[in-house]
Amino acid sequence: MNTTANLGKAPVRTLVLQLAIPSMTAQFVNVLYSIIDRMYIGHISENGALALAGAGICGPIVTLLTSFGTLVGIGGSITMGIRMGEKNHKKAEQVLANSFLMLSIFSVLLTVSFLLLKDKLLMLFGASGATFPFANTYLTIYTTGTFFALMATGLNYFINCQGFPLVGMFTVLIGAGCNILSDPIFIFGFHMGISGAAIATVISQILSCIFAMTFLLGKKVPVKITFGQYNLKVIRKILSLGFSPFLILATDSLILIFMNTVLQKYGGASQGDMLITCATIAQSYLLLITSPMIGISGGTQAILSYNYGARCVNRVKDAERNILGVMLIFTTIMFLLSRFIPRYFVLLFTTDPQYIRFSVWVIRTYTLMIIPLSFQYVFVDGLTALECPKTGLALSVTRKTLCVISAAVLPSFFGAKAAFFAEPVADGISSVLSTIVFLLLINRHLDKRCRMDKKESL
């Protein structure tokens, strides 16, 4: 697929597969940044377990940083997709210009803020005296590359929404390939330990950023990066549409941070660091599922927003059905694999029998409700793509609130291990709620869009 015109003409099922497969592949590969780092870190001689726990504490903070790229990328690409569906090239160009400006501003603000506050944040978010040096080293180096991380993440959405999913996938593959090759060189070859892991990640993000910017400044894309046409109304529109997916990622990070503090509190000095290490391994596995899920639901938003802008209601409905079908197939496969292969995954990080046994249990617990979670992802992202960000936001907040309450309450009655049941409890309840809300709203919302068309034609 080479142009946005295909988004309004090609068979819907073909479009969904053309966008979903490269996007989910890109997200899957993108997860390798953190997993490969953690895999090598876990095998550092003498202090691998402590270094892995330190990296685990940094993980949610790193995700929180890059989620600002998602905020602008998804909000901007949805807005731009609607404008392209309306055949308004000038407005689409303005959206990209304002998005680039916001990515630049967020990069500067986040870099300065996190460098100033990182020591206090790490201790607040679960670092112990033993793990703090490792977490501090990793986060300091990573934060200096915030600009490249946000640009690589945010700009890739604008590549995908213009009908270039394979290019978007290649943007991620460049960074991941570099990370895979450079990690062992910096960590073990140069004997840099956890510092080497962070440096390798930053270099990888620089390469992805350069590729994405070069493509969006080139001749192949219909809508290029320009400078000027800055408008507060456009910025507010982008932020409103991007806030729901941003909240999903940002609060995922905050929940992981909260989980680390709960595990440290209830695990105590004897088990706290061990529980966090096992949670880090299990969370790495979970990312192999949830990141491609984001790729499926987020990567196909361009189909929904373009046809919504063009007022092709039947294509919107058909797209949602096909997106949900792809998602259910993926989550069913991953649920089954989660029953049989966790041990082999855990062995990539550690050979300690106690860590292996408990990490496997956590993985199986985390993934209990992964199939119903398909409905939550597809319907929340679908509502956002159809200019219903407040509804999507409310559903996202509900899931996160349920997770926090469960993580806070369950350990006080059943011990530290009970905190791991917070995820499936929240996933199950929120998925049912999201399905009900979506089915009640979707037809009325699309009918309203059609009536707007008739009024405007008068």
Language model features with spans:
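Small-residue-rich hydrophobic transmembrane alpha-helices
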Residues: 52-112, 149-168, 278-336, 340-342, ...
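Short alpha-helical transmembrane segments in multi-pass integral membrane proteins
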Residues: 1-23, 80-147, 189-243, 304-369, ...
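Short runs within selected transmembrane alpha-helices of multi-pass transporters and secretion channels
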Residues: 142-160, 168-179, 197-212, 293-297, ...
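Hydrophobic/aromatic residues in alpha-helical transmembrane segments
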Residues: 21, 37, 76, 117-118, ...
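Transmembrane helical elements of multi-pass membrane transporters/channels
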Residues: 18-37, 141, 175, 204-208, ...
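Helix-terminus/linker motif at the lipid-water interface of multi-pass membrane proteins
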Residues: 28, 32-53, 122-129, 185-191, ...
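Residue-level signal for short hydrophobic patches within transmembrane helices
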Residues: 13-32, 36, 61-68, 144, ...
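Residue-level signal for transmembrane alpha-helical positions in Major Facilitator Superfamily
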Residues: 17, 32-33, 72, 113-117, ...
